[in-house]
Amino acid sequence: MKRAQTYALVFALTLTSTAATAIAGKRVEIPVSISSRFAQGALADARASADNNQYIGCYTTEYSGTCVAIDAATEASAACTTQDPEQLALIRSITTESAIVFSWNRDGTCRTVTVWTSSFLKPAATSGY
């Protein structure tokens, strides 16, 4: 639990430190980044990035889920899997305007999954590709 709180604090500090001045409310950009067993990023920012590398997302089946990230700067990749019902519910709540933070255990199972949906995140493009 303490580690989950630490990851949430790191994510919140990232949001605060990357905040840009905006005319109509606070806005932040959260590019995909990966560190030791921890990944984060906003779906809309990854999709709108100038590079063709960064990616973050999660998917589920009836009984399991997987989160995957590719860091634009280093092209490192990360993934974790889960069968935890609470984590699956969080993964299923992801929208195109969400930010995802996940961490994993040494065996590749998801330790934590956090989903943020907020007005300060970039809205998803409405025009598609």
Regions found by a protein language model. Name each.
Residues 8-17:
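Bacterial N-terminal signal peptides
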Residues 22-66, 70:
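N-terminal secretory signal peptides
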Residues 103-112:
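Short, charged beta-turn/beta-strand-edge "cap" motif at the junction between a beta-strand
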Residues 116-129:
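Short peripheral tails and domain-boundary helices/loops at the edges of structured domains
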